[in-house]
């Protein structure tokens, strides 16, 4: 299986673009729970967002254009994530004032650095990966999805081109990164949201990798750098929706 989209081949990886759009859609569904509606069940489809973003990072790192043609630090990729990690924190805090963790971008950034250290084995990327691991260990309580979430892109890199059942390994990390004690406790007495969340965490890596191995027969809008802005802007949009609903 080849998930690469190197510059010397025409076209884009439509499956990867579709995966990113589905991850965005899942994220927005999850955050609709905070606008004032009684839609707690949206927590279940929301479990697909983070693993699919991590899978997209793994695919980008595994492309021949990154890993073979130019085996060096992906400074531009890191820079965009770092910039939007900072830009997103204010709208994130405005929308989720009681949040005890940072927005998801720092988790994805650290995960990218660690996965890159494995994928592109040179002294610079290795040192950066070790620093990222140290920062994760120190500040994991402030990171969304914790240590397991930071390691998820690396786990996807390791299983990306293996048989589909290997997707169970990132599924374990997906469960560990979520509130698994509460989910399993809820599932033990039959809570449908808890049961659905566990199923979603297990299925997300499997479905994501299966999608990437398919070839969509329809056009997909390319997810280019402008798409980074969706993350902070969707918080502001949902904040506005909550304000309108609060006046009704």
Where are these regions (language model features)?
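Alpha-helical transmembrane segments and their immediate juxtamembrane cytosolic regions
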Residues: 1-248
